[in-house]
């Protein structure tokens, strides 16, 4: 992003930060980002600029009961939260924002009282800001390729900002400008309705910054570059049909037509294709190869950031209580709290005001929180290669292994899911279940043969595992294949592309921390599968003649690991 676009983005953000939602800044920590954040601190925002800790809890966000002051004063004392007054928040390490925090920030941004500047330090393509937050931030700045930055030169003039704020309520948006933005979003593959709304908001602000009260085509193009480039998908579109041949002009009409054309403003109306090309000109060089795959991986991973929490779906036996803070669903261990406060009563009464001799003096440091062991149902997700000549044998082995594991599942509370991939795509035949009757019914008559969409099977297994994890379960992926993938994610036969996509999905599985096992069913160990297992950080097991009992024993051991 060049200097002028950076300056325009900061000017738009400064005029009305709550209206555009905020800024998504992608940059690793270093002098470039430090200079940019120093510039942010000098912008004349209409609201306070406040730093938001990445581990902020609900008590800090919303406020609530101040336990320490309540215990000290003997009556309820409430404290305010960060969201009590309009602010522009700076969120460091935004790529590690949890889904829980992302949902709360999204709700706050919907009120149009706050703005968020997300500092995204993602080092890998599969690390991303939660979608709920990213979708609400109108502006995007990528400093990854920037080598130097002129911080003072990016600061907009204060007089220009104040004049733009005065003009903004008077800015009119013609209907044709709205149509251009909406059609451009459609052609760019942008499905979110917030995208055109944020682009139109940015266009109105740019118009006010120019000292005008009517949005022109150039404002729409400029706004599209600032707000839509990071959302666009590089769709491969068919070339438009050739225009019909022009009709021969009538005599004495050539001069009249030329005079009319001279009076038309070339920017008065723009085809949507111009908006599309303006946005595509802002895309990174490698976006055509990586963006579509990256969107698949983010969708599969839920877009919940690198710091997604793991919770159990069942509560186990009680654990010894520990000192802690009252937050979320924490419960006080009253006996342990009183036991902690008892030895200090004599000292505290001598320091306390008169009239508290018969009052039990408890401080926040005495609070003990009840704990229970988090129990989590386990689920083993089979991704079975059902392609090729050996498909029938592999499927029968998988059927037997699934039924054997289900027979053991009742005591251990394990679940089993079955995915097959053949032809051009993968298919979930059995969602996580412990029902023997349902499983046997689903396993009857499984088809086999066709191509090997290995990447599709791995992606489907990752999606199923993420869904199970979101319900508090502990998933393990078991990939049963000979490793000869030849079908890409789009269903085309391309062995080289299929291998590259399988490697990218393997990296995404590894980044999600999902345990996995790869069972090589080829007659001889496949070196490509060994590399894939290393990329996925999965256990590799060569079982060229895998029987149902042997497979069940191996995968049962993987569950216990």
UniProtKB/Swiss-Prot annotation:
Keyword Magnesium belongs to the record:
no
Keyword Lyase present in the record's keywords: the answer is no
Q: Matching SMART domains, A to Z?
A: VWA (SM00327)
Query: Under which main EC class is this enzyme filed?
Result: ligase
List UniProt keywords, sorted A-Z.
ATP-binding, Bacteriochlorophyll biosynthesis, Chlorophyll biosynthesis, Ligase, Nucleotide-binding, Photosynthesis
Disordered as annotated region, ranges = 234-268, 298-324
Q: Cite the record's Basic residues compositional bias ranges.
A: 314-323
Bias (Pro residues) occurs at: 237-249
The record, for Pfam families, names:
AAA_lid_2, VWA_2
* Disulfide bridges in this chain: none
Pathway listed for it?
Porphyrin-containing compound metabolism; bacteriochlorophyll biosynthesis
Q: Which CDD domains match?
A: vWA_Magnesium_chelatase (cd01451)
- Which family is this protein grouped under? Belongs to the Mg-chelatase subunits D/I family.
What is the annotated role of this protein in its UniProt record? Involved in bacteriochlorophyll biosynthesis; introduces a magnesium ion into protoporphyrin IX to yield Mg-protoporphyrin IX.
- Its name, as the record gives it, is Magnesium-chelatase 60 kDa subunit
Annotated source species: Rhodobacter capsulatus (strain ATCC BAA-309 / NBRC 16581 / SB1003)
Name the gene behind this protein: bchD
């Amino acid at each position: 992003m060049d200097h002028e676009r950076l300056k325009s983005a900061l000017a738009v953000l400064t005029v009305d930060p709550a209206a555009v939602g905020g800024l998504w800044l992608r940059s690793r920590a270093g002098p470039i980002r430090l200079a940019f954040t120093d510039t942010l601190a000098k912008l004349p925002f209409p609201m306070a600029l406040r730093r938001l800790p990445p581990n902020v809890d609900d008590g800090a966000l919303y406020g609530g009961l101040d336990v320490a002051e309540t215990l000290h004063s003997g009556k309820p004392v409430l404290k305010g939260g960060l969201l009590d007054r309009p602010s522009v928040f700076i969120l460091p390490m935004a790529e590690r924002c949890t889904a829980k925090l992302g949902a709360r920030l999204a709700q706050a941004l919907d009120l149009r009282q706050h703005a968020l500047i997300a500092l995204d330090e993602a080092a890998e393509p599969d690390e991303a800001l939660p979608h709920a937050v990213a979708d609400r931030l109108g502006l995007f700045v990528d400093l990854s390729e920037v080598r130097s930055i002129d911080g003072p030169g990016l600061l907009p003039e204060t007089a220009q900002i104040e004049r733009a704020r005065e003009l903004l309520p008077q800015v009119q948006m013609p209907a044709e400008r709205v149509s251009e933005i909406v059609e451009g979003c459609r052609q760019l593959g942008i499905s979110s309705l917030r995208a055109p709304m944020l682009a139109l908001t940015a266009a109105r602000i740019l118009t006010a910054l120019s000292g005008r009260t009517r949005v022109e085509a150039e404002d729409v193009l400029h706004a599209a570059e600032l707000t839509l480039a990071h959302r666009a998908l590089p769709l491969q579109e068919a070339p438009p049909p050739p225009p019909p041949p022009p009709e021969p002009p009538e005599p004495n009409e050539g001069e009249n037509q030329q005079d009319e054309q001279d009076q038309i403003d070339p920017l008065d109306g723009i085809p949507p294709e111009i908006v599309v090309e303006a946005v595509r000109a802002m895309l990174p060089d490698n976006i055509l190869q990586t963006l579509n795959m990256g969107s698949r991986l983010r969708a599969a991973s839920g877009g919940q950031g690198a710091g997604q929490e793991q919770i159990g779906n069942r509560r186990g036996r009680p654990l010894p209580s520990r000192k802690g803070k009252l937050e979320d669903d924490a419960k006080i261990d009253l006996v342990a709290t009183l036991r902690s406060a008892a030895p200090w009563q004599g000292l505290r009464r001598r320091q306390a005001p008169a009239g508290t001799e018969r009052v039990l003096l408890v401080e926040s440091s005495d609070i003990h929180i009840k704990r229970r062991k988090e129990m989590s149902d386990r689920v083993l997700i089979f991704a079975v290669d059902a392609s090729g000549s050996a498909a029938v044998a592999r499927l029968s082995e998988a059927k037997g292994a699934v039924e054997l594991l289900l027979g053991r599942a009742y005591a251990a509370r394990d679940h089993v899911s079955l995915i097959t991939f053949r032809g051009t795509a993968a298919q979930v035949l059995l969602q996580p279940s412990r029902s023997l009757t349902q499983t046997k019914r689903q396993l009857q008559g499984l088809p086999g043969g066709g191509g090997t969409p290995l990447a599709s099977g791995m992606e489907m297994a990752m999606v199923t595992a993420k869904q199970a994890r979101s319900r508090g379960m502990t998933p393990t992926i078991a990939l049963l294949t000979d490793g000869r993938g030849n079908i890409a994610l789009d269903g085309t036969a391309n062995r080289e592309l299929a291998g590259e996509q399988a490697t990218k999905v393997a990296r995404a599985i590894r980044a999600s921390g999902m345990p996995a096992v790869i069972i090589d069913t080829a007659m001889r160990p496949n070196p490509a599968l060994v590399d894939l297992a290393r990329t996925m950080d999965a256990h590799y097991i060569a079982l060229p003649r895998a029987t149902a009992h042997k497979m069940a024993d191996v995968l049962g051991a993987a569950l216990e690991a």
